[in-house]
Amino acid sequence: MAKDALVSVELASKFATEKETPYTRWVAAEGLDIISAHYIASLLTCDLKPWARRGGKGVYINHEASRTSNDCYVCEIAPAKQLEPQRQLFEEMIYVLSGKGSTTVCNDAGKRVTFEWQAGSLFA
C-alpha cells in the first residue's frame, strides 16, 4: 500500500472484491486454480494443474465470479490412464472435449455399469 494512503490496509481489505471462503480454500487445498469468467475462448487451452486426489490435471471455472460452488471444472485424463474413484454426493454432468475411453459407475448396492465415451459425449 502507498505510504500516503488515506485508509489502512485493514479497512481496505473489508472492501476487497476477492474474498476468501471455505470453498476457495478447498479448491486451493486441491492444488487447483479458479478461473472467474463468463467466457473462455477455448476449454482445450486452459492452464491445468496436477490434481492428486483425482489423478489427473484440472482447473475450476466459476461462471458468476461469485467465488461459490456454482461452478464447473476441466479435468484432463492422461492417455492410457484413469482417474481415481470418486463418490458423488451430487449430480455431475460430463462433457467430453477430446479423446475416448470408458467409465464404470456403481451404486451403494454394488451394481456396476460400464459405458464408453468419446469427444462430444455428454453423460451424467
Annotate the PLM regions:
Residues 61-64, 82-88, 105-106, 114-115:
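Short histidine-centered beta-strand/loop micro-motifs
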Residues 54-60, 71-88:
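Conserved short histidine dyad/triad with adjacent acidic residue
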